[in-house]
Regions:
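Generic detector of contiguous secondary-structure segments
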Residues: 3, 60, 64-65
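Short, conserved catalytic or interaction motifs in soluble domains
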Residues: 19, 43, 49-52, 63, ...
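A structural signal for short beta-strand/turn segments enriched in small hydrophobics and glycine
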Residues: 29-38, 43, 66-75
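Short, acidic, Ser/Thr-enriched surface-loop or helix-capping motifs
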Residues: 9, 53, 63, 69
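Acidic, low-complexity mobile loops and tails
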Residues: 1-40, 55, 81
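Flexible, active-site-adjacent loop/turn segments at secondary-structure boundaries
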Residues: 8, 44-48, 69
Length: 81
């Protein structure tokens, strides 16, 4: 199995949840499908969904919610399969 990095498509602030009281989109161990939302990047008060390009299991979350991110920063790592 290979590990796939899901990276930030935009510079901004990364969020693992839709709102402060919502559960996270993903956690370590979560099974995801291609196209699933894994988080949001806020840019100028606009929230942009970040989706997975692959199906698999989340093995690492590389940034915390509300961390600043730049284009290409690794957000999560997914074991494909």
């Amino acid at each position: 199995m290979s590990i796939h990095d899901i990276t930030s498509p935009l510079p901004g602030t990364f969020y693992l949840t839709e709102s402060p009281s919502s559960p996270p989109f993903v956690e370590v161990g979560s099974t995801i499908a291609a196209g699933d939302t894994i988080g949001l990047v806020e840019v100028m008060k606009m929230f942009n969904p970040v989706t997975s390009e692959v199906a698999g299991k989340v093995v690492e979350i590389c940034v915390a919610s509300e961390d600043p991110v730049d284009v290409g920063d690794v957000l999560i790592k997914v074991e494909e399969g």
